[in-house]
Curated annotation (Swiss-Prot):
This is Eukaryotic translation initiation factor 3 subunit I. It comes from Neosartorya fischeri (strain ATCC 1020 / DSM 3700 / CBS 544.65 / FGSC A1164 / JCM 1740 / NRRL 181 / WB 181). Component of the eukaryotic translation initiation factor 3 (eIF-3) complex. The keyword Repeat applies. WD repeats lie at residues 8-47, 50-91, 150-189, 194-233, 291-330. GO terms for cellular component: eukaryotic 43S preinitiation complex; eukaryotic 48S preinitiation complex; eukaryotic translation initiation factor 3 complex, eIF3e; eukaryotic translation initiation factor 3 complex, eIF3m; nuclear periphery. The gene is tif34. The keyword Transport does not apply. Pfam families: EIF3I. Coiled coil: none annotated. Component of the eukaryotic translation initiation factor 3 (eIF-3) complex, which is involved in protein synthesis of a specialized repertoire of mRNAs and, together with other initiation factors, stimulates binding of mRNA and methionyl-tRNAi to the 40S ribosome. The eIF-3 complex specifically targets and initiates translation of a subset of mRNAs involved in cell proliferation. GO terms for molecular function: RNA binding; translation initiation factor activity. It is found in: Cytoplasm.
Amino acid sequence: MRPILLSGHERSLNQIKFNRDGDLLFSVAKDKIVCAWWSANGERLGTYSGHQGAIWTVDVSPNTVLLATGSADNTVRLWNVKTGECVKVWDFPTAVKRVEFNPDGSRLLAVTEKRMGFLGTIAVLDISYGDSQGGALENQADEPSLRITCTESKATVAGWSYLGKYIIAGHEDGSVSQYDGKTGEQLENVQAHEFDHQINDIQFSQDRTYFITASKDKSAKLISSRNLAILKTYVADTPLNSATITPKKDYVILGGGQAAMDVTTTSARQGKFEARFYHKVFEDEIGRVRGHFGPLNTVDVHPNGTAYASGGEDGYVRVHHFDKPYFDFMYEVEREQLRK
């Protein structure tokens, strides 16, 4: 697996995202710039500039028409993917830590930071796709259609379950909440991780019926969207920043590493700066991919399961296209199932 090294950022990566087709990869970092890349060869398509602060989060609509970003300049910006122009800016009282489109792209959630006397909130914005020619994308609602306020522990990440039925949020205290996608009422709250070890990432399976969390408590959990039942636990030896579920094969990929301030030796091995592959069903670690010089902040997998990308504290994005052995690898039990 020879990685493609994408260097377009001057500072550490915050989030990377493949689009629904998997031909594009979007990356955001602490340097105010959004980059778009061809995922097949790592060529840079272009950049989206306009933010005034570090960009924490990015998401692309299912039809790859709009791109949303959330930043430390307290705004959510909506971009036209094709032309690179900013079509809408929403202002918030505090920084925006996570944005995500619902499965049909008609709504966008934004998680805001708890700061300066403002409580952390999850705001839902209605998204319009203009006329049939793709014009008039500027006509977006000015105010959120729904606001969920996190009175107890602030939400750090959030996402939509299947059909946009629930909003699932991960919190600073290690708990996971389920909210009604229409009314915003809290239906369920589960202490999924150790108390006060915040959840750094939530990523869903392709059908959005379950999701994986990555936490500072050095573990990742597979959780059902319907009732927040914990299905599987993957234990690592380092705090985790990101986790993703691979389609096609039953694996999960975890990314982490010691926080930059805790690193005492800079050997790539020492800080445990590798992407770890675990078997989704059996919870065993099956391999690691090295390469980053610093913690992995974000991992994402190609929607066809043919490649994955990781973004690190070192400012690089690495795209790995899987080789044949990756797809051929099976446990003995899996082979027996096939023989039947």
